[in-house]
């Protein structure tokens, strides 16, 4: 696909997935796209845990977001570690956001659907529980889990506002 076709095709898929495995090569390509994202001061604070099958995902189901993860044949958990960021403002939010968007676009390009799951993991107890299951060191923080797979149901898209409702030229409110 052309880049803008991928951007326009990406959406947040919140339904069930087909029970079709995601090949390792595709998971690796999606993860590489995330790791190639812009990151502040080259801190490279993002760490990914690839959950390559349902067996790897299963221990997370009782923690949070069961309805979004249960049918996913694969997922990627996005963590950040800011322990090496000492003398400058912490940009881990920007770093993991850029990595996550790159992975969503890469998944779309390969024909998969996904959704950015973060809300359920804002709860510190849930975050620590996921980290414990995945054996993640305490200096890392769970930011997002991306379930990945082929959609089993028709896509449901929310309409986007018109371009000129969200864009101004030179000064706020001015249009071309």
What label would you give each PLM region?
Residues 1-176:
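Acidic, surface-exposed loops and disordered segments
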């Amino acid at each position: 696909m052309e880049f803008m076709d991928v951007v326009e095709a990406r959406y947040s898929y919140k339904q069930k997935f087909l029970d079709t495995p995601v090949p390792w090569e595709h998971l690796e390509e999606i993860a590489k796209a995330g790791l190639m994202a812009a990151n502040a001061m080259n801190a490279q604070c993002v760490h990914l845990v690839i959950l390559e099958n349902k067996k790897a995902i299963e221990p997370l189901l009782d923690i949070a977001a069961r309805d979004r993860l249960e049918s996913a044949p694969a997922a990627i958990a996005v963590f950040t570690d800011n322990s090496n960021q000492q003398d400058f403002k912490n940009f881990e939010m920007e770093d993991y956001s850029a990595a996550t968007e790159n992975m969503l676009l890469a998944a779309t390009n390969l024909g998969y659907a996904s959704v950015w799951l973060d809300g359920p993991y804002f709860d510190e107890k849930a975050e620590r529980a996921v980290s414990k299951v995945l054996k993640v060191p305490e200096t890392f923080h769970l930011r997002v889990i991306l379930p990945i797979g082929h959609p089993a149901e028709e896509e449901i898209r929310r309409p986007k506002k018109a371009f000129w409702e969200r864009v101004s030229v030179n000064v706020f409110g001015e249009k071309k």
